[in-house]
């Protein structure tokens, strides 16, 4: 089966990951002790995408948890599904990375990385046909960003032909958790551009906005935010885990969404977003889902898709519906909003349909868009980076761990190149490209 090995790094990654395993276990009818209590054979049919059957019929996640300090791990272990994980798969240091990318990537992280890779190797060896890896981490801290990207590059060396998908929490525009976020994020993006296949961009502020607007809790907790993210992670892989009419997997997703190798940073969204209390009162239709899914307010990262154009997009529907209706809606979206889609990639929405909806809903949809508007996010981080780097503020923390200023300069220019690549394709028209083709033919 097409297994996926899940890796969570740092505090943020572990908290999102813990929530994700609650959602997935619930979908497959697995209780916190690792026993199956489901009511349908479909839950078991492909349960081994994310789970492994251990001795004594215990079902265990194919998960690897790592951090440079024990705190978050302890709370995951003490959490509702803490007993589900294999005890050997918790790998942690004692010193912490102290929000310092260099500590995570070069010093503290490098000491721990071999024991992490051992666990990854064991999990990968336990798979029949490994599809790839998914990593949850944040880019603002030290461990998730520094050690997370170190692990990604090591896995890349070892498994070059497997898909590497990350769920990366970017620094938010208005709220900042740490002062050195711009440094950590820029150094991480520098790595992700080269070593990841698909990066789903998330940010806390956008998640807060979604929570306030639609889910209407009085004060959204991180638990609520992480729940939103888990819904998307679950949606992305639902076709692998349940039967469907139009299947998709991580590789199909990459092939359909990435027109140029460096442009693999995606916006994600989910529908229906209704508050927990009012779920049962709303009947949903495919047009409603589509409209909500493409709504700019539903994007889980702080970029407005209306400020750019979609190169490609993917819509994954779950629930009982006709594929004909899905196709009509996708066509409808492209025709009505044609100015928001580049004209030189015709029919640029991939859709897939999985028959089994998530718990508590009749139907749902997950949206993944490759939009040029994502450059707003990179621009914002780059500006903050430049402001500090020009004065060499806080640099001694990084150079003290053995980093070189040159690496900062390279990361900065890589990020700026990425922004201008997005801009170039946003401005490109079908006609221009055509002219170049004619010239080439004439040369022959």
From Swiss-Prot:
Q: Where is this region: Disordered?
A: 423-444
- InterPro entries assigned: Beta-tubulin_BS (IPR013838), Beta_tubulin (IPR002453), Tub_FtsZ_C (IPR008280), Tubulin (IPR000217), Tubulin/FtsZ-like_C (IPR037103), Tubulin/FtsZ_2-layer-sand-dom (IPR018316), Tubulin/FtsZ_GTPase_sf (IPR036525), Tubulin_C (IPR023123)
- GO cellular component terms given for this protein: cytoplasm; microtubule
Q: Organism source for this protein?
A: Euplotes focardii
| Function noted in UniProt | Tubulin is the major constituent of microtubules, a cylinder consisting of laterally associated linear protofilaments composed of alpha- and beta-tubulin heterodimers. Microtubules grow by the addition of GTP-tubulin dimers to the microtubule end, where a stabilizing cap forms. Below the cap, tubulin dimers are in GDP-bound state, owing to GTPase activity of alpha-tubulin.
**BP-aspect Gene Ontology terms:** microtubule-based process
The lineage's top-level taxon is: Eukaryota
Any one Gene Ontology molecular-function term assigned to this protein's record = GTP binding
Output compositional bias ranges, type Acidic residues. Answer: 429-444
Subunit relationships: Dimer of alpha and beta chains. A typical microtubule is a hollow water-filled tube with an outer diameter of 25 nm and an inner diameter of 15 nM. Alpha-beta heterodimers associate head-to-tail to form protofilaments running lengthwise along the microtubule wall with the beta-tubulin subunit facing the microtubule plus end conferring a structural polarity. Microtubules usually have 13 protofilaments but different protofilament numbers can be found in some organisms and specialized cells.
Q: Which UniProt keywords apply?
A: Cytoplasm, Cytoskeleton, GTP-binding, Magnesium, Metal-binding, Microtubule, Nucleotide-binding
The entry's GTP-binding residues are: 11, 69, 138, 142-144, 204, 226
Among Pfam families, the record links this protein to: Tubulin (PF00091), Tubulin_C (PF03953)
Which coenzymes or cofactors are required? Mg(2+)
Q: What is its main location?
A: cytoplasm
| Family listed | Belongs to the tubulin family.
Residues binding Mg(2+): 69
**Protein's name according to its UniProt entry:** Tubulin beta chain
């Amino acid at each position: 089966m097409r297994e996926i090995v899940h890796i969570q790094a740092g505090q943020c990654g572990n908290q999102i990951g813990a929530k994700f395993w609650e959602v997935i276990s619930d979908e497959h009818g697995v209780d916190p002790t690792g026993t199956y209590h489901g009511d349908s054979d479909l839950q078991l049919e492909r349960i081994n995408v994310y789970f492994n059957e251990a001795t004594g019929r215990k079902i265990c996640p194919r998960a690897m948890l790592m951090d440079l300090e024990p705190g978050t791990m302890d709370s995951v272990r003490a959490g509702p599904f803490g007993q589900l994980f294999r005890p050997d798969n918790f790998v942690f240091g004692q010193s912490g990375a102290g929000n310092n990318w260099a500590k995570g990537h070069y010093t503290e992280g490098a000491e721990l990385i071999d024991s992490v890779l051992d666990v990854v190797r064991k999990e990968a060896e336990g798979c029949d046909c490994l599809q790839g890896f998914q990593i949850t981490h944040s880019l603002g801290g030290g461990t998730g960003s520094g050690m997370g990207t170190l692990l990604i590059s090591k896995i890349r060396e070892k498994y070059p032909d497997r898909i590497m998908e990350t769920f990366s929490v970017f620094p938010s525009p208005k709220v900042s958790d740490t002062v050195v976020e711009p440094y950590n994020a820029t150094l991480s993006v520098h790595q992700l551009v080269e070593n990841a296949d698909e990066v789903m961009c998330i940010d806390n502020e956008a998640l807060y906005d979604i929570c306030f607007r639609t889910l209407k809790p009085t004060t959204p907790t991180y638990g609520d935010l992480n729940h939103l993210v888990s819904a998307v992670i679950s949606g992305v892989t639902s076709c692998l885990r349940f039967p469907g009419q139009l299947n998709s997997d991580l590789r199909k997703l990459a092939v359909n969404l990435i027109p140029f190798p460096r442009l693999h940073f995606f916006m994600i969204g989910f529908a229906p977003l209704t508050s927990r209390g009012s779920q049962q009162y709303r009947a949903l239709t495919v047009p409603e889902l589509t409209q909500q899914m493409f709504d700019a307010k539903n994007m889980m990262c702080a970029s407005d898709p209306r400020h750019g154009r979609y190169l490609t997009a993917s819509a994954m529907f779950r629930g009982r519906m006709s594929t004909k209706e899905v196709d009509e809606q996708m066509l409808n979206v492209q025709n009505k909003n044609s100015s928001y889609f580049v004209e030189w990639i015709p029919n640029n929405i991939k859709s897939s349909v999985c028959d089994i909806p998530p718990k508590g809903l009749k139907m749902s949809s997950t949206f993944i868009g490759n939009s040029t508007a994502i450059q707003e996010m990179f621009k914002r981080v780059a500006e903050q980076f430049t402001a500090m780097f020009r004065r060499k503020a806080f640099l001694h923390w990084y150079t003290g761990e053995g980093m070189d200023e040159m690496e900062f300069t390279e990361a900065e220019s890589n990020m700026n190149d990425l922004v201008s690549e997005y801009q170039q394709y946003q401005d490109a028209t079908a006609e221009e490209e055509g002219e170049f083709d004619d010239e080439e033919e004439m040369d022959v």
